[in-house]
């Protein structure tokens, strides 16, 4: 099972890189946007999503865009959480706000959050509009639950 989870994580990471913009302003935005996704991580959330989809009879490729969206949003929340908690490190390297300052880190975190919507919308091509909207509804509900939980923690 571990090898399968690792495979799903690698599958997700490869697709995620396709959604990271390679354009200007690199130094002040897009290099920062890519910083957390490029760091080593377990990719547990997207891997479990793909494994769950497979358990219900879907192909891994059917769940891939949603897995990418989850990982992008997770990284966005990590950027903001590190600022809120004044964390020095993330995944063995300086946290983004320590590396680039709070304003640029907030902006990069926002961009990561916005980027998550494109793979969700790209689901229309493979899953159709009805299922895509259901997934989007669930994703939005989960995002709100996460920020509400963070509000309680703060």
Q: Model-derived features: where do they sit?
A:
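Mg2+-dependent prenyl diphosphate-binding active-site environment of isoprenoid biosynthetic enzymes
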Residues: 23-154
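N-terminal amphipathic/basic leader segments beginning at the initiator methionine
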Residues: 1-20
């Amino acid at each position: 099972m571990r090898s399968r989870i690792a495979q799903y994580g690698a599958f997700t990471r490869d697709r995620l890189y396709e959604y990271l913009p390679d354009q200007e302003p690199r130094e002040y935005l897009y290099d920062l946007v890519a910083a957390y996704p490029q760091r080593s991580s377990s990719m547990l959330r997207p891997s479990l999503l793909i494994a769950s989809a497979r358990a219900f009879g879907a192909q891994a490729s059917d769940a891939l865009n949603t897995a990418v969206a989850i990982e992008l949003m997770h990284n966005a929340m990590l950027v903001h959480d590190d600022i809120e908690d004044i964390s020095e490190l993330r995944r063995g390297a300086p946290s983004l706000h320590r590396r680039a300052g709070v304003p640029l880190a907030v902006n990069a975190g926002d961009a990561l959050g916005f980027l998550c919507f494109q793979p969700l919308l790209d689901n229309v091509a493979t899953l159709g509009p009805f299922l895509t909207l259901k997934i989007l509804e669930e994703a939005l509900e989960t995002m709100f639950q996460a920020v509400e939980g963070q509000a309680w923690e703060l």
